[in-house]
């Protein structure tokens, strides 16, 4: 449903000052080949070379998404997109999440992840619908993350460490762009059967990682001999 405001020149062609306003309810948008956003509703305002979407709601592979505002500008052979995207607390499929953002933002060693987030992003979209120059800033409330433990060196210091490491109730700030990611976070960590505290700063540039991590182990015993010698 929409309203259309058009003006014509002397030759009967539509002028560039047109404006189309309206809304879509319970729509469906196919993206990324086999995937789609369902139950899609939003308000739109279309002008020449500029498109604005407000109050968007939709479901992507059982992930409930919402956005207050998305701005799209057409520039030559591509679209420049800037907006905000949120999801409520939910269990997230890792492959689905990575496909949504066109990359490998989440490690596939993650077995379970449950979080709510607010994300601000910019990217360009070409005619083949390929995402380029993605920049993403996220505020995340991480309720649970279970990570398959392949950190064999920890077993030298913490006897009988779990096969999977669990994070709970973390608050994270993530700044992502191509070949670069910064993560700052803090929350609970479960290495065995008791809870300790983990604080961390992680920087990745290309294939190089820089970790600044502090773990406050008050509940789980560690082997000091392994550390000292």
Q: Residues of each region from the PLM?
A:
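Membrane-proximal interfacial segments on either side of biological membranes
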Residues: 1-229
